[in-house]
Regions:
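Gly/Pro-enriched, hydrophobic low-complexity segments
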Residues: 122-200
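Bacterial N-terminal signal peptides that target proteins for export
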Residues: 1-8
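Short, surface-exposed coil-to-beta transition loops
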Residues: 54-56, 74-75, 82, 149-153, ...
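An acidic-aromatic
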Residues: 58-110, 178
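Flexible, processing/modification-adjacent segments and terminal tails
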Residues: 21-46, 50-52, 90-145, 199
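Short glycine/serine/proline-enriched coil/turn segments at secondary-structure junctions
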Residues: 47-51, 78, 146-149, 174
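Short hydrophobic/aromatic-rich beta-strand segments that constitute the beta-sheet cores
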Residues: 40, 67-71, 86-89, 139-140, ...
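Bacterial Sec-dependent signal peptides at the C-terminal "C-region" and cleavage site
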Residues: 11-22
Length: 200
């Protein structure tokens, strides 16, 4: 087996984690991001279920504050954030209906948080204490007891590509959590602004 010296290991470490080594470097990488498009797979693990609930869809982000979070299956729906306005639409049969239910404020909170992440501002929300760990891992823990009853912690894994998130785990408690994995990521490709407006 070929011997790898300590200098080589240091160089490899800088190559793979350099952009995620500090909050400043993360924000600097995010400033170079004009758009991100990615497919995602979501698994919701509940203690009462033998198998996780699976769904998949697409994420589209355009700096600084436009976001489209679309579930394509099994239940089609889309969340849109366009210059501060947040809307949700659900598909029933062949038609789309805007959802103005009581759950929308919680979804707005999530969309705004994702918007911060896309801009590299992981430590910018006063509701969470942010900790940056080696290897590009970020751990967010609630500061207030009320929020901690809903979210125990959020763990994000940054990708090797600067400005990109590889996965997100949202823990409700030790036994129930939601896992998101991103793939087919395209950075700084042209995006039609109409994608952030819904035409039902």
């Amino acid at each position: 087996m070929r011997w790898v010296g300590p200098t080589t290991l240091v160089v490899l470490g800088l190559f793979t984690t350099g952009w995620s080594s500090s909050w400043d470097s993360i924000r600097a990488a995010a400033r170079d991001i004009q758009s991100i498009q990615a497919a995602f797979t979501q698994e919701k693990h509940l203690q009462i279920l033998a198998r996780p609930l699976q769904s998949h869809g697409r994420l589209i982000f355009a700096a600084p504050d436009r976001l489209r979070w679309e579930y394509q299956a099994p239940l089609p729906s889309v969340l849109l954030m366009d210059e501060g306005r947040i809307q949700r639409f659900v598909k029933t049969g062949d038609s789309w209906t805007e959802d103005a239910s009581a759950a929308l404020p919680a979804m707005s909170f999530v969309m705004q948080e994702i918007g911060r992440w896309m801009n590299g501002r992981f430590d910018d929300n006063p509701d969470f204490e942010a900790r940056l760990e080696p290897g590009g891992k970020i751990v967010l823990t609630p500061r207030q007891a009320a929020l901690a009853t809903v979210i125990q912690k959020i763990v994000l894994q940054l990708a090797e590509t600067p400005g990109v998130i590889d996965s997100v785990n949202v823990y409700e408690d030790d036994h129930n959590f939601t896992q998101l994995h991103f793939n087919e990521v395209a950075v700084n490709q042209p995006i039609d602004p109409a994608l952030f407006k819904h035409h039902s």
